[in-house]
Amino acid sequence: MLRRLYDWTMSLASGRRAPLALGAVSFAESSFFPIPPDILLIPMVIARRTKAFAYATIATVTSVVGGAVGYAIGAFLFLQVAEPILAFYGYLDKFEQFGARFNEYGAWIVFIAGVTPFPYKVITIASGATGLDFAVFMVASVLARGLRFFVVAGLLYLFGPPIRTFIEKRLGLMFTIFVVGLVGGFIAIKFL
């Protein structure tokens, strides 16, 4: 079953519409979607190494644009929905303190979240909700997302065939590691 799923992903990744799917997933992941674009970027680069940097560009640009939408969600919808609730429970002042602290380190928070597997959408929405300077947000987003996607694409470009062979020979192990990492990430987010 894993082999069929892998083969299907590889055929999808080398398909004509793969760049469009990558752009859509990258955009959505930055604002509301839970699946990281690496799920498509990695097999796409493995399937077509010569397009590695074009794919990284697509992922970066659409992710940053999606991040701007996430920022807008935080700036315009979060306060309309959450502010009355926070005020009702007496937490509005605590949120304002959180916002001040968040904005003090905002560029670093956005950058770190942008290069790690941490759900980037949480930070894009929080950046808008706390009023982080939009220019600071965008610069940190471009640098972080660009670094993340170009490093992944670059490594796969340089070491493509051996990595593909490694993945194909150890598909079960790779899937197990992925699932454990995914579940561990969700648990860490829930309890940290």
Residue ranges: model-predicted function:
Residues F76, Q80, A129-V136, K190-L192:
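Helix-coil boundary and interhelical linker segments in multi-pass alpha-helical membrane proteins
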Residues F78-Y89, V142-F150:
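Juxtamembrane non-transmembrane "cap" segments at the membrane-aqueous interface
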Residues D7-V61, R101-F166, L182:
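Hydrophobic alpha-helical membrane segments of integral membrane proteins
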Residues Q80-Y105, E168-L192:
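Selective transmembrane alpha-helices of multi-pass membrane proteins
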Residues M1-L2, A153:
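Short, membrane-interfacial amphipathic segments enriched in basic
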Residues V64-P84:
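Transmembrane alpha-helix/helix-exit interface in multi-pass inner-membrane proteins
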